[in-house]
Amino acid sequence: MPKINTSSSGWLADISLFYERRGTNTKLVHREQVGPLMVQRPFYPETGVAHTYLLHPPGGVVGGDQLNINIHVSPQAHSLLTTPGATKFYRSSGAISSQTQNLTVESDGFLEWLPQENIFFPDSQAQLKTQVELHKDAHFIGWEMNCFGRPVLNEIFENGFVTGRTNIKVDDQLLLSESMYIDSIDEIKHAAGMRHYPMLGNLYIYPASEALEEKLRTLIDENFHEQPELFGSSNPICGITEIDGLLVIRYLGHQTEPMMACFSTLWQHTRQHWLGKLPEVPRIWAT
């Protein structure tokens, strides 16, 4: 493990968003922000759901930057958050950048956490932390997509360092605690979890049910076995696991678009399973 300079001379960005149910809609009732993280005003392409775009104006994260994101969804509120593009972690001369996400959903609240991918440039130094706190009667679907290097440009993650920690709790009971440790291309080649793939995605869904799990397994089989043309020659791997009422879908691949297509399909059908209709896909994903 290389020596990391944890001193910070970069941006400190902190944002907290609080959503509440007001009548038939969900409202962003309170926000607190420091630094360049901000959101556009929520909009409502579908009744009752507050769609929100999370913006980081400088366009990327450099060594020493610290991003803290806090989302709180109150009872019966329903919010969907995404980003207008990839979050890019640029090369660092030694200072570590960090992104911490705290997501809280109360009873009968509904949070869809759907950011676009993280891209870690060679020589980037980054630390990711995600803490999800759910009430047992909450609904949550969230993903993270991480790209190490820029495979589309044949630029590999030869040097650099990325750590990650994700904890998911339901009623203060820890359901999932997992870590990620990537230290240069050797980790990608030899780590049991990466299998030479430069992209790793995780999709988390709560609550699980046998019917939903079977539906998503069928979708994965159909996408990977019956529509191989969608994935070209990238030969991705995707699997699903149920852990104490939480569904975890893992994806390994070489390209962003197939991973996004897979996760988006699973998200849409999960929403349909829960609410009886397909969601409105964020328009920003098509730009």
From Swiss-Prot:
A single Gene Ontology CC term: cytoplasm
Pfam family, one: UreD
Record's keyword annotation contains Nucleus: no
Keyword hit for Transport: no
UniProt superkingdom: Bacteria
Keywords assigned by UniProt, alphabetized: Chaperone, Cytoplasm, Nickel insertion
Compartments reported by the entry: Cytoplasm
InterPro entries hit by this protein: UreD (IPR002669)
Coiled coil: none
Record-level Gene Ontology MF annotations: nickel cation binding
Protein's job: Required for maturation of urease via the functional incorporation of the urease nickel metallocenter.
Subunit structure, as described in the record: UreD, UreF and UreG form a complex that acts as a GTP-hydrolysis-dependent molecular chaperone, activating the urease apoprotein by helping to assemble the nickel containing metallocenter of UreC. The UreE protein probably delivers the nickel.
Family membership: Belongs to the UreD family.
Annotated protein name in UniProt: Urease accessory protein UreD
Organism: Aliivibrio fischeri (strain MJ11)
